[in-house]
Amino acid sequence: EGDYTGVVFTIGVDSLKSVSPLAERTGVLDPSAGGSDMYWSWNSGYIFVKMEGTSPGAPLDTPSGQRPFMYHVGLFGGYSTPTLNNLKEVTISFGTSVASVRQAKTTAPEAHLFVDVLKVLNGSTNIDFTLNPVVMGNPYSANVANNYKEMITLDHVHND
């Protein structure tokens, strides 16, 4: 029971889970059970946000005739060697609203969030596919991570 004024969550896979033995990484975090497309085996780490596609702004790939971009953003700070830390903690304040949880109630409150995926590209940093068609573990990934932290906002809370 209680009155909640906000929520805090992390985008990414925390460092403790990232360095735990593979046998302890179950469900969607098990790289051998369908989660391999969101895991870097070469870097022993998870991809937090993945975007791939084509853009008129990306450089031309002559063999394919396409203009591809590939963004695989991860890194949690490193296990034995320091790396970038692209884990992002997001705090959503409910403002003047309160989510009231009561044992006697048959329904739980709901916080409705908006996810503006475009913010990944045009948040505090405008992403330029011309200059950065491929982003993975390089320093530029921190710009993308700072952008995805900004993509989630509160629409409203209701308690009925």
Could you tell me what each predicted segment is?
Residues 1-160:
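A short, solvent-exposed, low-complexity linear motif enriched for acidic/polar residues
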